[in-house]
Amino acid sequence: LSRFHFMYRKRIWNEKENSYLGWERKRGMLNQFNEYLLGHELNPFRENTIKEEIQKEETITLPKFKYIITLDADTDLILNSALELIGAMAHILNTPVVDPKKNVVVEGYGIMQPRVGVNLDISYQTLFTQIFAGAGGIDSYTNAISDIYQDNFQEGIFTGKGIYNLEVFSKVLRNAIPENTVLSHDLLEGNYLRCGLASDVVLMDGYPTKYNSFMTRLTRWIRGDWQII
């Protein structure tokens, strides 16, 4: 199977949104992607180069996947960060244990969140980012840092960029959240799967370059957070 593939979801009518969009937005995309890779669901995508390649080459089959790394469009992996995330998830002390009655992870971690910095070029792009984005780029002496949630509760806060165990994610979250009920799904997923903070692994992220775009993003985040309280 080739290393790079492209998938594009079908849009369906959503009565509450009064528009055509991908089922359950990003949360639905992850669920459908997971179920497809695990063989639990037929192709839910409008464009799927994996399916096309398998159909062309009879000797090619869909391999088994253990971990998925999720990134936003403006998030960059840096040298060895993917390998370090995989190593952290594969550590025996981090192996997720699912409670059969509650169907949530009670030991180990089903998902891990790295530390996220700001791209160097973005941090100096405008006067706004120079003031609010902080020091961008990579610290040459990067190491583990303290985090109040991880230190006190042995769990971090998942913000949508990280790595998760594919089978555990599917088992715990496949039918856990009703449709059209949440806007911000990252916090919920982290709570169900038990999120661990890998503060010694760093990803580089973008940053809004203008006040208007910053406030639009902040408003969306606040709406999502209030909705799940």
For each predicted feature, which ranges?
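Internal catalytic domains of large membrane-associated glycosyltransferases
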Residues: 1-229
